[in-house]
């Protein structure tokens, strides 16, 4: 039990039952990341399972708030300074609609690289099941860079230069004003795979932790999902509807993307009028059929090919991490990820 209100703003909860004060539920399981490793597709496929309830939004980030009350602090922090769910009551309310016979989960991809999330989750729900997903480091970081460019978290368009900024950003320099979690932009921190999984193994028994490999998931979506269902102890015999989600794209026009985001967030003066006009003229399905192809033609584009020389540099740099993860998990990721030919 959590005896008092901790640094993340948590109230007491009976971890053995997953029931918080007032009868609200703490999740039975957490998909803790990594980002760009299929977590969105897995989330969407689990949502379709009748015995599973997933939070909306997908990523509450509650247990990853290392600087939980930044608005009350004058400190300069590399930690999260956004406005996600501020109280434990707000957080557990996300799961209030779950039926008693459903497994309850969420999928905050920040939990895997957060330095405190594992301990906080264990304090709130010591019997929780944890799902972690790892991807070949160089391709993961490139995909992450493209994703953060598209969300305007990152402003350095060159992948090489962005990675080379790690040292300066660790000191709080050369950070985009739009970054509400600056440490997310320190790329080398994101591939400390062994340390990430060790944080969970330190507070959860091995049988409560499932480690998946992204390349396995890509090769066999259905098989991986059935493995996950068995781990969560829900019916794995039901049909699996394969979902493609959160495809990595490059940004064709930063200005058009910023305009699109301001409309969707309601910040543009004409946003409400445009939304109401669209609703009056077309169905939601028709709007989506028009919207997404239009965005792909005007705002986004297929990413350019990766810089092969820099990708090789990254693989050489991260080979010791891959070797360490292989040894820790007892699986030959060196061969699977093509590091056996890298000197």
Question: Which residues make up each language-model segment?
Answer:
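Alpha-helical packing segments of well-folded alpha/beta enzyme cores
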Residues: 87, 91-94, 117, 193-197, ...
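Acidic-and-aromatic substrate-binding clefts and catalytic sites of carbohydrate-active enzymes
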Residues: 81-85, 109-115, 188, 216-220
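Surface-exposed cleft-lining segments at the edges of enzyme active sites
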Residues: 108-109, 176-189, 305-310
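PAPS-dependent sulfotransferase catalytic core
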Residues: 1-108, 123-133, 137-177
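Short acidic (Asp/Glu) patches
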Residues: 111-118, 124-126, 250-254
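PAPS/PAP-binding and catalytic site of the sulfotransferase fold
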Residues: 40-49, 117-126, 142-147, 192-236, ...
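Charged phosphate-binding loop/patch that engages nucleotide di/tri-phosphates or the phosphate backbone
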Residues: 184, 191, 322, 328-342
């Amino acid at each position: 039990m959590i005896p008092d209100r901790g640094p993340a703003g948590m109230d007491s909860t009976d971890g053995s039952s997953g029931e918080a004060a007032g009868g609200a539920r703490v999740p039975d399981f957490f998909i803790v990341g990594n980002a760009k490793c299929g977590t969105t597709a897995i989330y969407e496929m689990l949502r379709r399972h009748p015995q599973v309830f997933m939070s909306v939004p997908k990523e509450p980030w509650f247990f990853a708030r290392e600087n939980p009350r930044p608005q009350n602090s004058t400190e300069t922090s590399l930690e999260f300074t956004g406005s996600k769910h501020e109280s434990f009551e707000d957080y557990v309310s996300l799961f209030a609609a779950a039926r008693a016979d459903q497994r309850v989960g969420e999928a905050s991809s920040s939990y895997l690289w957060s330095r405190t999330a594992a301990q906080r989750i264990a304090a709130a729900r010591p019997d929780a099941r944890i799902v972690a997903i790892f991807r070949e480091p160089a391709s993961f970081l490139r995909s992450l860079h493209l994703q953060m460019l598209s969300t305007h978290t990152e402003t350095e368009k060159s992948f090489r230069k962005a990675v080379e900024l790690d040292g300066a950003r660790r000191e709080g320099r050369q950070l985009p004003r739009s970054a509400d979690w600056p440490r997310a932009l320190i790329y080398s921190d994101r591939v400390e795979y062994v340390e990430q999984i060790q944080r969970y193994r330190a507070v959860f028994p091995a049988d409560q932790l499932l480690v998946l490999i992204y390349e396995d998931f890509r090769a066999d979506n259905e098989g991986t999902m059935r493995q996950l269902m068995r781990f969560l102890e829900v019916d794995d015999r039901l049909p699996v509807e394969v979902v493609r989600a959160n495809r990595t794209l490059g940004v064709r026009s930063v200005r058009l993307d910023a305009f699109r985001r301001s409309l969707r967030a309601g910040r543009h003066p004409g946003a409400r009028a445009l939304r109401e006009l669209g609703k009056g003229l077309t169905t939601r399905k028709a709007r989506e059929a028009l919207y997404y192809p239009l965005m792909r033609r005007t705002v986004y584009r297929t990413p350019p090919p990766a810089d092969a020389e820099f990708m090789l540099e990254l693989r050489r740099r991260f080979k010791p991490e891959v070797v360490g993860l292989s040894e820790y998990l007892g699986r030959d990721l060196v061969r699977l990820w093509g590091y056996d030919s890298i000197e």
